[in-house]
Amino acid sequence: MEEDSPATVCVTGAAGFIGSWLVMRLLERGYVVHATVRDPGDLKKVKHLLELPKAQTNLKLWKADLTQEGSFDEAIQGCHGVFHLATPMDFESKDPENEIIKPTIEGVLSIIRSCVKAKTVKKLVFTSSAGTVNGQEKQLHVYDESHWSDLDFIYSKKMTAWMYFVSKTLAEKAAWDATKGNNISFISIIPTLVVGPFITSTFPPSLVTALSLITGNEAHYSIIKQGQYVHLDDLCECHIYLYENPKAKGRYICSSHDATIHQLAKIIKDKWPEYYIPTKFPGIDEELPIVSFSSKKLIDTGFEFKYNLEDMFKGAIDTCREKGLLPYSTIKNHINGNHVNGVHHYIKNNDDDHEKGLLCCSKEGQ
């Protein structure tokens, strides 16, 4: 940590997949962390935070809600930096405009107002999404920070997770406008699909997509058809690195590996032969070009990625197995002609929340 780095920061969405790992890394570095969650009294959802090393002395939980103006004021007061990760996620929402899109936009604007009111916040780091960049009819070979998704195209297609892509795009653009003219440095980090080990108790929404070849969740194949990936730990290290870098500004793509669905299927099939992995995908071409997200801007600052694609999936699969979120094999279920139902049945019998997470991405923030 730099000598003049702030000691106190706020992390929104701290109980989630990315947020909890970021809190862990911040505590390790000696930061005092104000972590916002929906309900600090719900031990089932915050126990993993309270059990972190240094949590007793350096972690405080705050109740906050993106839909309630001013609910982040108290948590942000006295902080020098804010990491905004909280976001509504429910890919099966019946009212995405009011349940996903509006709360995401209004939430980031409310947090910016809380930062201004605090008068202590110097930097706001916003966790954006690859969906703000490549939501376009014709995929480019390489994307960088200058690209933005075509919302008209997304609205017309309404592909899996479309409301998440729209909400993140509009929220990031609104944040850039709202932070002009104040003394708060605003940075957005654009992760691709986040994969790796985790400390939350339920199936992370990101892994619903990443492990869809194992679970047979075909609705998510379109997302990994020409996929880009980053390890959870690399992403959290990137957040802290850019926060501590006084020269950091603008948007930063954080992505270390690219793979088509065919390449990913081969990697998983070779490394974990106990899982049935499809090799043919109706409607998806056999020969697919790689679509890459360039992290050149980030790497040019001196940041280094530590993990490869196999590391990401090993961490994710091992953790899911340890927590009872994935069976150790699906070959038997496939032989019996019941691959997908077998996996879903296994998860449901272990925890109803896990089933909810696998099938529709739980409403918890990332």
UniProtKB/Swiss-Prot annotation:
Record-linked Gene3D superfamilies: NAD(P)-binding Rossmann-like Domain
Positions annotated to bind NADP(+): 45, 164
Disulfide bonding pattern of the chain: none
Pfam families hit by this protein: Epimerase (PF01370)
Entry's EC annotation: 1.1.1.219, 1.1.1.234
Coiled coil: none
Catalytic activity line of the entry: a (2R,3S,4S)-leucoanthocyanidin + NADP(+) = a (2R,3R)-dihydroflavonol + NADPH + H(+); (2S)-flavan-4-ol + NADP(+) = (2S)-flavanone + NADPH + H(+)
Signal peptide (from-to): none
InterPro entries in the record: Epimerase_deHydtase, NAD(P)-bd_dom_sf, NAD(P)_dehydrat-like
Family to which this protein belongs: Belongs to the NAD(P)-dependent epimerase/dehydratase family. Dihydroflavonol-4-reductase subfamily.
Protein name: Dihydroflavonol 4-reductase
Source species taxonomy: Eukaryota, Viridiplantae, Streptophyta, Embryophyta, Tracheophyta
